[in-house]
Amino acid sequence: MFLYLCFIFQRTCSEEMEEENATLLTEFVLTGFLHQPDCKIPLFLAFLVIYLITIMGNLGLIVLIWKDPHLHIPMYLFLGSLAFVDASLSSTVTPKMLINFLAKSKMISLSECMVQFFSLVTTVTTECFLLATMAYDRYVAICKALLYPVIMTNELCIQLLVLSFIGGLLHALIHEAFSFRLTFCNSNIIQHFYCDIIPLLKISCTDSSINFLMVFIFAGSVQVFTIGTILISYTIILFTILEKKSIKGIRKAVSTCGAHLLSVSLYYGPLTFKYLGSASPQADDQDMMESLFYTVIVPLLNPMIYSLRNKQVIASFTKMFKSNV
């Protein structure tokens, strides 16, 4: 089906270009933060440090969960998967941005652009599904504590993880397939620091209304479904906690769920505003800042958010550190 769509869209593009006798652009310029040329070196160093800390933090968390048998439970399986996705998301965007800070040419080929876009949509969507899965896991742990081992079996956890990654891949394939109908013949300037769908649609000389509709339908559906799952899960958790009227239980629930709620807020806030304001042609700078937050800053913060207030993770880290000294 995907190959058929690609064939149809490529054929349509070639026919349109033959009719218009236009020149097809196959390279683009990522403007990024070019409007601040005096800050190139400081920005390069800042983002390099952020990227290194992000990779070390997320990979370190994965290794910690993998090595400690006490962390081989669903909650940490999902957390390790989130750390992997965060490291992948940051690696999709940051290296190219760092190269562009130092390179004279800011060019990116169409094929490179499509690969980056595909990787970005896959990781961003997968993270949405993972955050929803983690909310469901917390719901079962708090509201159905006695049945938790029965419900959250290894088989179910693996299925939820696989579905999250498949959902991310399918979402990316849909937008990638529809992007083959686009042609670029007027401008090759992408007002962004990576290849994203909205900036590409803005410079396309093909009618991109179908693509905008696909973004609205599919990206909107993913956000509504995952945010809805998270809100329902935590609403039930809240009522369950209030019914128990136990200070100790409330503290434990807040400690367990607080990190996840903070991560969800930081991630979905800019992501939602980005697509709500994407139709505005004046929103380029704001769009870049929102994108920077959920592609670079959130992957940096997540390991800290989930680790600093988690006694099990801290104890595991201390134990592993002492054993290696």
Swiss-Prot record:
Protein name: Olfactory receptor 5H6
Extracellular side: 1-41, 92-115, 177-212, 275-287
InterPro entries the record matches: GPCR_Rhodpsn, GPCR_Rhodpsn_7TM, Olfact_rcpt
One Pfam match: 7tm_4
Single GO term (MF): olfactory receptor activity
Transmembrane segments: 42-62, 71-91, 116-136, 156-176, 213-233, 254-274, 288-308
PANTHER family assigned to the protein according to its UniProt record, in alphabetical order: OLFACTORY RECEPTOR
Ranges per topology, Cytoplasmic: 63-70, 137-155, 234-253, 309-325
SUPFAM superfamilies: Family A G protein-coupled receptor-like
UniProt-annotated location(s): Cell membrane
Keyword Transmembrane helix: yes
Swiss-Prot/TrEMBL keywords: Cell membrane, Disulfide bond, G-protein coupled receptor, Glycoprotein, Membrane, Olfaction, Receptor, Sensory transduction, Transducer, Transmembrane, Transmembrane helix
Source organism, top-level taxon: Eukaryota
Disulfide bonds listed in the record: C113-C205
Lineage of source species: Eukaryota, Metazoa, Chordata, Craniata, Vertebrata
Function of the protein: Odorant receptor.
